[in-house]
Amino acid sequence: MFKSFFPKPGTFFLSAFVWALIAVIFWQAGGGDWVARITGASGQIPISAARFWSLDFLIFYAYYIVCVGLFALFWFIYSPHRWQYWSILGTALIIFVTWFLVEVGVAVNAWYAPFYDLIQTALSSPHKVTIEQFYREVGVFLGIALIAVVISVLNNFFVSHYVFRWRTAMNEYYMANWQQLRHIEGAAQRVQEDTMRFASTLENMGVSFINAIMTLIAFLPVLVTLSAHVPELPIIGHIPYGLVIAAIVWSLMGTGLLAVVGIKLPGLEFKNQRVEAAYRKELVYGEDDATRATPPTVRELFSAVRKNYFRLYFHYMYFNIARILYLQVDNVFGLFLLFPSIVAGTITLGLMTQITNVFGQVRGAFQYLINSWTTLVELMSIYKRLRSFEHELDGDKIQEVTHTLS
């Protein structure tokens, strides 16, 4: 699954994590400020699309390119791989675009406060605000949104090619060793379907995880700052950094709840694919052999399919009750925390909108597992099938892939 696309996967991912950690620590610990002072960057980032080509952002772009370039150069020399440009540089590009789209969210959040304060001023003091001011603020938002739309579309196009290259790498790897694998139940489905589903699902999960981490890095300091405007929480009362603590506790409660109620789902999904594969294989044999796929055999196999599906439906029923109930309460949880401050009149409409947006971003990042649980169940099921598939190759000499396909 990984060795077909990445060079020495275990070492590669460990080195990528360590190198990324070093780069982030250097930048956050003062390296970014040091570079900004040398280059004369002001640190004042405009609340508009111009922020994305301001000197501060251009410095970070250059820093990212240097870090990725050094890492890629090392791996190109240390362990050349047929798919190295897609697996290393392609992954780095996806990570960069994910960060960029998070920064778009930061820009929109910065725009919320002045825009909604402008609305509050207009509603409370007639004719004090001109319509041109509203047009100007909407123009600022549209400028940011246009960049986000263009980048998102281009990123989706690139990711589609990235996923197909990964699928191609796995397909080549398995087909090079097909004679060892062809006798395994459902081997054709593993190569034809599961490689595609694994690459696309893991890529989506990976991007979502990176997005959650970068969202926390970008929005958590903002939430810490905004917590000063909300000194009291309902029921609890006064608590420092209450919004941050509430986001963490609420997200952990939801994650723990779904982990408990959904613990059986991955195993059932895995078993479901096995009984489906057995049923499908018997039908395929029956197309060419009249002695196969007889009614008693088919009834027995389909009975196993029905039994497993009914068990799956039952377990998903109480899982979805817990998940949907939690998410419905979650929709109003952020606003519920602001009730004391709203009643006391200590926050404006713009500040309230900004706080609820930032709180939602941080809470959503902490709720990564909650939002991805059903996808995670599917991914674990696919991984189990492919891993059991690859056990046939463990300990055997793997045939090298010599042909090319790009």
From Swiss-Prot:
The chain crosses the membrane at residues 12-32, 57-77, 88-108, 138-158, 206-226, 243-263, 332-352. Residues 33-56, 109-137, 227-242, 353-406 are cytoplasmic. This is Peptide antibiotic transporter SbmA. Keywords: Cell inner membrane, Cell membrane, Membrane, Peptide transport, Protein transport, Transmembrane, Transmembrane helix, Transport. One of its GO terms (molecular function) is microcin transmembrane transporter activity. The keyword Hydrolase does not apply. Belongs to the peptide uptake permease (PUP) (TC 9.A.18) family. Disruption phenotype: Mutants are resistant to proline-rich antimicrobial peptides of eukaryotic origin. It is a multi-pass membrane protein. Uptake of antimicrobial peptides. Required for the transport of microcin B17 (MccB17), microcin 25 (Mcc25) and proline-rich antimicrobial peptides (such as Cathelicidin-3, Arasin 1 and Dro/Drosocin) into the cell. Residues 1-11, 78-87, 159-205, 264-331 are periplasmic. The gene is sbmA. The keyword Protein transport applies. Pfam families: SbmA_BacA (PF05992). It comes from Escherichia coli (strain K12). It is found in: Cell inner membrane. GO terms for cellular component: plasma membrane. One of its GO terms (biological process) is microcin transport. InterPro entries: ABC1_TM_sf, ABC_transporter_sub-D, SbmA_BacA.
